[in-house]
């Protein structure tokens, strides 16, 4: 008996399935139950009524390029290290079109954030999110941030993006160079929210 069919939960099926497993629905007594995302547990309801999402994909990536001072790039933000990478869906490699990118394991809405410390003494920095190599997806440009004053500036860009499984997301400079302070001062984060 299937409780979830075509992404729809049937309350009749829940009643039948839980009754078949000896669990009372009338008293809202539920034994530990898990919903799966592929082979990963996506949601757990404990017998105490707690709901957790232990394996939703998420990451915090940064550049760990050695040195000090400001770095610049005209392409993809070189996030070649992670603080955490739940599900291992962030690619820190430097080859291929999806380098320094998060690849969606499932269809859904994801939240992405890019926070950085910029140096813009002579240039405008416009980091933005690219999906599958394009900044123009769903007819909308996501996450453009202009920083164009002299000296150092902090900057945070975030966006909710609906992705299909195997879509990938990167941070790139829209035009010109993207200036960022080395190592841990600039981070690219993301997680599945629904």
Predicted region positions:
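Short, intrinsically disordered N-terminal pre-domain segments
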Residues: 1-15
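Terminal (often C-terminal
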Residues: 8-9, 19-20, 27-32, 36-40, ...
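Short, surface-exposed tryptophan/glycine-enriched loops
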Residues: 152-168
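Short strand-turn-strand beta-turns centered on an Asx-Gly dipeptide
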Residues: 130-134
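Extracellular carbohydrate recognition and processing domains
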Residues: 140-156
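Beta-strand acidic-aromatic groove motif in beta-rich domains, primarily in extracellular
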Residues: 122-129
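Short beta-strand-plus-loop segments that form exposed binding edges in beta-rich domains
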Residues: 172-178
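Exposed beta-sheet edge/beta-hairpin loop segments within beta-rich domains
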Residues: 102, 159-163, 175
């Amino acid at each position: 008996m299937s409780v979830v069919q075509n992404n729809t939960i049937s309350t009749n099926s829940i009643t039948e399935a839980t009754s078949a497993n000896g669990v009372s629905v009338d008293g809202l007594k539920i034994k530990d139950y898990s919903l799966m995302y592929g082979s990963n547990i996506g949601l757990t309801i404990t017998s105490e009524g707690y709901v957790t999402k232990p394996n939703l994909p998420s990451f915090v990536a940064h550049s760990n390029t050695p040195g000090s001072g400001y770095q610049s790039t005209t392409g993809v933000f070189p996030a070649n290290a992670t603080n955490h990478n739940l599900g291992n869906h962030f690619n820190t490699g430097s080859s291929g079109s999806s380098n320094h990118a998060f690849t969606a394991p499932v269809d859904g809405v994801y939240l992405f954030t890019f926070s950085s410390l910029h140096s813009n003494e002579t240039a405008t920095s416009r980091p933005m999110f690219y999906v599958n190599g394009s900044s123009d997806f769903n007819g909308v440009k996501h996450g453009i941030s202009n920083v164009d004053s002299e000296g150092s500036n902090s900057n945070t860009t975030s966006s909710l993006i609906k992705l299909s499984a195997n879509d990938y997301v990167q941070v790139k400079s829209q035009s010109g160079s993207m200036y960022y302070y080395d190592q841990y001062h600039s981070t690219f984060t993301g997680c599945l929210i629904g």
